[in-house]
Design a protein with these regions (language model features):
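Aromatic- and glycine-rich beta-strand/loop motifs that create alpha-glucan
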Residues: 2-52
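Short hydrophobic, aromatic-rich alpha-helical segments embedded in or entering the lipid bilayer
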Residues: 2-7, 26-30, 208-248, 255-256
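Junction motif at the cytosolic side of a transmembrane helix
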Residues: 2-13, 239, 249, 256-285
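Short alpha-helical transmembrane interface motifs in multi-pass membrane proteins
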Residues: 15-18, 45, 77-81, 89-94, ...
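Transmembrane helix boundary and interhelical loop/hinge segments in multi-pass membrane proteins
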Residues: 39, 92-117, 127
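Hydrophobic alpha-helical transmembrane segments of multi-pass membrane transport/permease proteins
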Residues: 41-66, 76-95, 136-137, 197-204, ...
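Transmembrane helix segments
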Residues: 59-67, 182-229
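Alpha-helical transmembrane segments and their short interhelical loops
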Residues: 119, 123-196, 200-202, 255-263, ...
Length: 285
């Protein structure tokens, strides 16, 4: 009896993660369906997640249409590649961070913790939701970029491979960071401000809304510490012609460095998730 009582207490201290057993995958896949139903029933969330990056891309593409950046490249094309990276990060980091913080504050995580459901199933469900939304978001932004900014799809297997690993590493990286940062807001009301403010600033200095060459060097140095800058740089190497490499501060796409930075942040995000995730709000102790 004492051993059985000690197990929940130990799980509470470690975030409540039960072993990842085959049953967790079955429960997790079922949880993906639940998460998708809840997400698409919330029309405001659907509009916010999918429309905001697309609307920004249309606006920026229309404002800067026909304006040349350099070497025959349009400013709109630069924005399109950057906003695709920003969309990947926002869909995973911002949505997960705010969503999990809200569910914790409303007591939903506490109730899930008290059910027989394997703890990993919750994270599998969230991961499935992020993958579906991120793929859909990226397809939408690529389509808008092709219509508005003459963005072109990659024409070589090498570029498609680069797109694949940048997309996967970027999504995993920002999903883990979104789960980790969800523990910072103390209430659902404060979650959007706590999470969106630093992320918005990061977008401006990481080449999402402003070309990297126009960002002051000291701000570029700050941005280079975070993963968003490297995701955007990797996607520019996919969607822009090779001559656009001269617009990069380093004069190179730096694929090796992009991979190392993203892998380092994935490791850091995993550690943060394992050490900081809470099933209960601060009010519940």
């Amino acid at each position: 009896m004492s051993t059985q009582m000690a197990q929940p207490a130990a799980q509470a201290r470690t975030g409540g993660a039960a072993p990842l057993l085959p049953g967790a995958w079955r429960s997790g896949l079922g949880r993906v369906g639940v998460e998708l139903k809840v997400f698409f029933r919330d029309k405001q969330s659907v509009v916010f997640v999918f429309s905001l990056p697309a609307v920004l891309l249309v606006m920026l593409g229309s404002i800067f249409r026909g304006q040349a950046a350099a070497h025959g490249l349009s400013v709109g094309t630069l924005f399109a590649a950057g906003l695709i990276g920003g969309g990947i990060a926002a869909t995973s980091f911002q949505y997960l961070g705010i969503g999990i913080a809200t569910e914790r504050d409303q007591g939903m995580l506490k109730r899930l913790y008290g059910t027989p459901m394997n703890r990993w199933a919750y994270f599998i469900g969230k991961t499935g939701l992020v993958v579906v939304c991120t793929v859909a978001e990226t397809m939408l932004l690529v389509a808008v970029g092709m219509l508005i900014d003459n963005l072109r799809l990659p024409t070589s297997a090498e570029r498609w491979w680069t797109f694949a690993w940048v997309f996967v590493l970027g999504t995993v990286c920002f999903s883990l960071l979104g789960i980790a940062i969800s523990s910072i807001p103390r209430s659902a009301r404060s979650a959007p401000a706590v999470i969106m403010l630093p992320f918005t600033v990061l977008q401006f200095i990481s080449g999402v809304y402003v070309p990297a060459t126009l960002v002051p060097p000291w701000l570029r140095d700050i941005a280079s510490f975070f993963p968003l800058k490297w995701i955007c740089q990797g996607l520019r190497s996919v969607f822009l012609p090779q001559r656009a490499v001269v617009l990069e501060p380093a004069g190179s796409w730096e694929h090796g460095r992009i991979a190392l930075v993203l892998l380092a942040w994935i490791a850091a995000g995993l550690v943060l998730c394992l050490t900081t995730f809470r099933w209960r709000s601060s009010r519940d102790g």
